[in-house]
Amino acid sequence: MKRERINPETLELEERVVQINRVSKVVKGGRRFSFSTVVVVGDGKGHVGIGMGKAAEVPDAIRKGAEAAKRNLIRVPLVHATVPHEVVTKFAATKVMLRPAAPGTGVIAGRGVRPVVEAAGIKDLLSKVYGSNNPVNVVKATFKALSEMTSLHEMASRRDMTPQELMERRTRRETEAA
């Protein structure tokens, strides 16, 4: 399945720096320092992208990371400011679980998950990170999880239902559990 290209110029994107890391390269004359950044961009309406930048100065690294994130945009299906279904994704040694939450719950997420889901416009979410909590891998695992989300219409058509029937079934199950 080919991913659709999203034009970043048509969106009002907001940048968030997740991590700034000073890295060094050992050369004959000593160490050469540079900066590595992880940047998340999103419009708060279902579009999000992640990028990494590396440069001798922090502002250049942030700019490069933001440009990479704008080239890497995806659309996230939202249902009432949360995700449509639970998803568990693994990236490297990091495993991320994202679950839909009731309105008013807020984003219950750690350092790497929060900026990605907030940039996407998700207001209510439950999440858990298993395994490695390296911020780069957590951000990439979260991004992978969001890219694997299917919309409510796709889920309903797969089950030969209407989206309304699917939502009614979900709310009925949630009220029975409470």
Curated annotation (Swiss-Prot):
Stored NCBIfam families: rpsE_bact
Function: With S4 and S12 plays an important role in translational accuracy. Located at the back of the 30S subunit body where it stabilizes the conformation of the head with respect to the body.
Transmembrane parts of this sequence: none
Keywords, sorted A to Z: Ribonucleoprotein, Ribosomal protein, RNA-binding, rRNA-binding
Keyword rRNA-binding applies: yes
S5 DRBM domain location: 13-76
SS bond list: none
Region annotation Disordered: where it falls in the sequence: 156-178
Subunit structure: Part of the 30S ribosomal subunit. Contacts proteins S4 and S8.
Gene Ontology MF term list: rRNA binding; structural constituent of ribosome
Protein name: Small ribosomal subunit protein uS5
InterPro entries: Ribosomal_Su5_D2-typ_SF, Ribosomal_uS5, Ribosomal_uS5_bac-type, Ribosomal_uS5_C, Ribosomal_uS5_N, Ribosomal_uS5_N_CS, Ribsml_uS5_D2-typ_fold_subgr
UniProt-listed GO biological process terms: translation
Family from the record: Belongs to the universal ribosomal protein uS5 family.
Domain-level remarks: The N-terminal domain interacts with the head of the 30S subunit; the C-terminal domain interacts with the body and contacts protein S4. The interaction surface between S4 and S5 is involved in control of translational fidelity.
